[in-house]
Amino acid sequence: NNYSFADNSALDSLFIPETVTTINSNAFYNCSSLKNVQFSEGLVNLYSNAFYNCKQLSEIVLPSSLEKCEGAPFYGCSGVKKVEARSVIPPTTSGSCPLSNVNLNDVVLYVPSWSTSEYTLANGWSSFYTVEVSDFMPQYIKVNKDFYFTVRDTVSSDYRPNISMTYSSVESTDAYGHSNYERGNLTVSGRSKLAVNDLSIVVSPFAKYYSDHNVANGYEYDNYRTNINSTSLIVNGEMRAENVRMDLNNYNSRWQFVTFPFDVKVSDIVPQKETTSWVIRGHNSAMRAAGKVDSVWVNLTADDVLEAGKGYIMHNYQPDYTNSWFWVYPLKNSVNRQLIFSSEDRTIELEENLAEFDHNRSWNLIGNPYPCFYDSRFMDFDAPFMVWNSYNQNYVAYNPADDAYILSPGEAFFVQRPFEQESITFRKEGRQTHRYAREMELEAPARAKAASNNVRTIYNLTLQQDTLIDRTRVVFNDAATLAYEMSRDAAKFASTERNVPQIFTIADKTRYAINERPFANGEVALGVYCGTEGEFTISLDKTYGCKVILEDKLNNSFVELSVDNSYTFSALAGEYLNRFVLHFENEATGVDNINVDDMNADDAIYNLQGIKVNSTNNKGIYIKNGQKTIIK
């Protein structure tokens, strides 16, 4: 505690046991006879002036477990000539040198061989003029920020450290200008193998869904909770571990899609609190293909084995907290046990199940196979895929050719197996330690293929009620057909939550999350589901040349949608499959290219595509004498 041994002139030697995690401010203030201090592994926090003015100290060895060394704990210790900092990650300081008010010309700072650049750049530690490499090999490595570990060629085969990847309460601004709490991101390289005794990582797939804000893309990371952000491990060399533990964090009372980078027995998923109730289910692709909706999700038993790279759904409840923590251990004696350390491409086999309707065929629930963030554009896959938004409790479709969607560690998602494709390969180049999309030009295979295709125009529409939001997409592509194509389209999956609003397009009785089609007559049926009575807003995220007119048949209204103009309507709970129609005005062949003189000459009537029509018996928007006319 503060001032516990202050001004104790009889104290000449001190041993700090491993049970002590914190030494508070001024604890050994002005102990004038203190010559020797031995810190044990386990010390985490060392605060201001803890050893103020202890001038008899000549050497300080700080343990590898130390995370905070704030407020100059060794202020005025002028006798110190050697400081050995054994933490691989420099302990955070308040900006001041841990050894302040001392002539640092006479002091040498010794640090681990992997950490020289980190210490010379770190606040406080950069005050030391002389930094040399220590012979000490840390046995405990706690990674709570970005760290690049290059294994030395001369590393002993007996060296087996314990590595804990975790989060930090320290906030910093990253290279993308975002202010976030730091978390452990470890990249391992080198020609020698890194053999680890114990490794622990943190996986929190739901962290990307920002529970306090609503954003157009349907997800945003929650930067204000230090204990939910996932860590990232990227292995570019060779790494193994005797024991691995995943700390899995799930939000309470919501379904979460999860995957694991190794095989797991259900009984090896252990709640950290005994009061946690939970269930995990597998996906039956054959039942979905057969249209047996009630049999799609299968309850799993304690003896079932969850396969690496496959997807599952979890639901949990913990009465004392908003989220639940689990310890997850890999299945012993499994060939996939060390897959978490894979430095190569990963391939996931896809199951094929024929169906009467193509939109039900061969849906597979798979997952990010790496213990790091992954750029979906690097998958050997160019068809749409479906993710579960655990905040909105709905499905959202993305296309690697159009979207820079970043998969979280432990995140599962749906893909529909295309014809002739038996597997998906995750290229190792897609691995990354952060959650932001990289800027690139045709590096990813899906993006390159899209660039070589016909011109594709994308329209994203959202339906919003209060803080809940859902999205559908229309893509115009002359190479597409009006029929459902697994390589281009994505069926709309209904949410399991009855109160969640949903939006989709409709064609030939099929509901689409992504509807890629030729322009044809420029009309697309739009369906909505309103889970509760209330007000709803339909919005368009961008305008791409075409004008988008939303027709509300119930209200006999037409509204031009744009970035600045949405449409709000009231509705009772229920489905509305015939109420809305989207009219797309193709300006390349539409109104602007019609010869106005010809129109005026015979009082002709044209539709929005510039095609002459014989009558206006149907409701819609028409052009007469160069002016738009609405027929209600």
Predicted regions and their residues:
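Extracellular, surface-exposed repeat/solenoid domains
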Residues: 81-120, 522, 541, 547-553
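Compositionally biased Ser/Thr/Gly- and acidic/asparagine-rich
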Residues: 257, 265, 292-307, 311-611, ...
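Structural signature of tandem-repeat unit edges
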Residues: 8-22, 32-45, 54-68, 77-92, ...
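Active-site-adjacent structural elements in enzyme catalytic domains
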Residues: 220-321
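Surface-exposed repetitive/solenoidal architectures
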Residues: 29, 115-159, 248-251, 259-262, ...
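Extracellular beta-strand-rich, repetitive "passenger/adhesive" scaffolds
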Residues: 3-11, 26-34, 49-57, 72-79, ...
